A protein has these predicted regions:
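Conserved long alpha-helical elements within nucleotide-processing catalytic cores of c-di-GMP signaling
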Residues: 1-2
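Conserved subregion of the PPM/PP2C metallophosphatase catalytic domain
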Residues: 5-178
Length: 178
């Protein structure tokens, strides 16, 4: 996993390519270097056109290699799992293309990314775990980000340490005029 992480960071560092293209390049490097590892990954970036800037909007663009979907929290519309068709893990096939996905972001929106260790444990399947996460996020969505993440971990993890667990939350703030 460490090799894959380093390759991904190196390729993504100064690229303007789409997230799907970055993941495809990682697949190609893994095949070319004959690294026999596989991993899930999700790469995302927040973009903004001049027109979106005038309107205070942004676009979340992401591509997933077998990773769980991000969750979008909207102050005025609740919680939405950004489900997409599943795609293969990194390191499985270097020749197939990957897909980009996008969602419009408004001021106040929060996007939450997480590892499977947060939602999958014991007899709880991934679907149940994601459902629990979305319910929890709905209850906590007005909190400052650090507190939101701490509360999510405190309510869902409950002493488990059998898998890696990570939560990352990004909130869109209103832009300054000028």
């Amino acid at each position: 996993m460490g090799q894959i992480r380093s390759i991904l960071r190196g390729i993504a560092y100064d690229r303007t390519e789409s997230p799907a293209r970055v993941l495809r390049r990682v697949d190609q490097v893994l095949a070319g270097l004959q690294i026999g590892s596989m991993a899930t990954a999700l790469i995302a970036r927040i973009e903004q056109t001049p027109e979106q800037a005038r309107r205070g909007l942004r676009t979340l663009r992401w591509s997933s290699a077998g990773h769980l979907p991000p969750v979008l929290l909207r102050p005025d519309a609740g919680v939405q799992v950004l489900e997409t068709a599943p795609e293969r893990l990194l390191g499985v096939n270097a020749t197939e293309t990957r897909s980009d996905h996008s969602a419009e972001l408004r001021p106040g929106d929060t996007v939450v990314f997480y590892t499977d260790g947060l939602v999958e444990h014991g007899r709880t399947g991934i679907d149940e775990g994601v459902e629990r996460l979305t319910r929890t996020l709905g209850e906590l969505q007005g909190l400052p980000l650090e507190e939101l993440c701490d509360q999510v971990l405190g309510r869902i993890v409950v002493g488990r340490t059998d898998d890696d667990i990570a939560v990352l939350a990004v909130r869109c703030h209103p832009q300054n005029a000028g």
